Amino acid sequence: MAACVKTNKSHVIFKKVSRDKSVTIYLGKRDYIDHVSQVEPVDGVVLVDPELVKGKKVYVTLTCAFRYGQEDIDVIGLTFRRDLYFSRVQVYPPVGAMSAPTQLQLSLLKKLGDNTYPFLLTFPDYLPCSVMLQPAPQDVGKSCGVDFEVKAFATDITDAEEDKIPKKSSVRLLIRKVQHAPPEMGPQPCAEASWQFFMSDKPLHLSVSLSKEIYFHGEPIPVTVTVTNNTEKVVKKIKVSVEQIANVVLYSSDYYVKPVASEETQEKVQPNSTLTKTLVLVPLLANNRERRGIALDGKIKHEDTNLASSTIIKEGIDRTVMGILVSYHIKVKLTVSGFLGELTSSEVATEVPFRLMHPQPEDPAKESVQDENLVFEEFARQNLKDTGENTEGKKDEDAGQDE
C-alpha cells in the first residue's frame, strides 16, 4: 500500500525587477487587510546588485493617493492628484535597528541569499481602502479613486524628489488595502412602508426582508417581498434592485447611485389581496462593465476586480479623508394603477440597507511559509469572485514593466 505523503501548499511570491536589474522587490501578497482596529503591514525584501547600485542608497516607499480622474480636470489641463499618505525607509545600506524579520522575510532571505534586505511599511488607521470609479469604455487616463503604491529605487540624490528618481533604477507596484466582513453580523435587515391613496379607505402595505445583513461577492441575495393591498387599486408590477451608493467625500461630497442588479415580476396584486414573493438578485461586475461611475475595489492595470465592498469606518475617524465611501441597499418599487386604471400608474418604493463584502480569509497563523514551497510570479492581479470570469495569472521570472 502506498504511503500517504502530505504536501505543503505553495506560497506565491510576487516579484518585480527594475529595468537596469539593480533592484528587485519581492512581496508575499498584493492585498493587505484592514481589520478596522489595525491594518496588516507590508513586509517584503529587496534584492540589490551592489555592482549596479555602485554606492547609491536604496529606498522603499509607500504612497496612498486620491486621483480625481478624467472627469475632474483643472483649468490648466492637468489631472488632479492628492497624496493622502507617504512613508519611506532606507533598506541599503541598512540604517538603525531593524525589527525582527517576519516568517516570510526569513524564508526569502534564506532563498535569495546575500544582498537581500527586508523592509516593513505600515498603514495609519485613517486611510481609505482601495476603490475606484469605473470609467466609460471611451475614457482614457487615470480613473477617479484611491490607490496604494509600493516603490523601490536606487539613487545617489539626498531626499530625492519623484521626478529626479531614475526610472531605470526604480520599480513600482500597486497594492490594495481591503476590508473583509466582520466576524459578527448585524440584525436581519427589514423594512415596512404604507401608502394612503386618494379615494381608498385603507392603505397599501409593503414589507421587505433579507435573510442576513452581510452578503459575499457573487452570493445570491434572496429578497422576500409581501404586498398587502387593501386599496381599490391594482399593483401591476414589483421591481427589486440592488443599488450601489458611492459618496465621494474628499472634495465635493458627490453621490453616485447606480443600480447593479434587478429583477421584477409582472404578477399583479388585485384589490383586497396579499402576495408574498421572493426574488433573487446577484450583483456582479460582469453585468456592469460598460457603465461609467460604478464603484469597484481598486484594480491594477488591465486585470480584473469586483464591485466595491461596503465601507467600514473606524469610530472617531474623519469621514472627509476616506476618499470614496461605498454602501448598498435593496430598493423595492411597486407600480400601482392610477385614476384611469391601466392607462395611468404611479410608483412607490422603500429601501433596505445591507453590506456586500468578501469573507474573512484563512487565519494566516495556520499557514507556514516553507523555503521549498516559494513560487515566484509576475506581479499581475488575479480575478476575484464576482466577475463571472476566470483567467489564470501569467508567471514570469523577470517582470519588468511598471503597473
From Swiss-Prot:
Keywords, ordered alphabetically: Cell projection, Membrane, Phosphoprotein
InterPro entries named in the record: Arrestin, Arrestin-like_C, Arrestin-like_N, Arrestin_C-like, Arrestin_CS, Arrestin_N, Ig_E-set
Quaternary assembly: Monomer. Homodimer. Homotetramer. Interacts with RHO (via the phosphorylated C-terminus).
Modified residues (Phosphothreonine): 231
A Pfam family: Arrestin_C
Protein species of origin: Rattus norvegicus (Rat)
UniProt main location, coarse: other
Region of interest (Disordered), residue spans: 381-403
Subcellular location: Cell projection, Cilium, Photoreceptor outer segment; Membrane
Single GO BP term: G protein-coupled receptor internalization
Notes concerning its domains: The C-terminus interferes with binding to non-phosphorylated RHO. Interaction with phosphorylated RHO triggers displacement of the C-terminus and leads to a conformation change that mediates high-affinity RHO binding.
Domain of life: Eukaryota
GO molecular function: G protein-coupled receptor binding; opsin binding; phosphoprotein binding; spectrin binding
Annotated protein name in UniProt: S-arrestin
Transmembrane intervals: none
Lineage, uppermost ranks: Eukaryota, Metazoa, Chordata, Craniata, Vertebrata
Function: Binds to photoactivated, phosphorylated RHO and terminates RHO signaling via G-proteins by competing with G-proteins for the same binding site on RHO. May play a role in preventing light-dependent degeneration of retinal photoreceptor cells.
Gene Ontology terms: cellular component: membrane; photoreceptor inner segment; photoreceptor outer segment
Membrane topology: Peripheral membrane protein
Expression tissues: Retina and pineal gland.
Family that this chain belongs to: Belongs to the arrestin family.
The keyword Iron belongs to this UniProt entry's keyword annotation: no
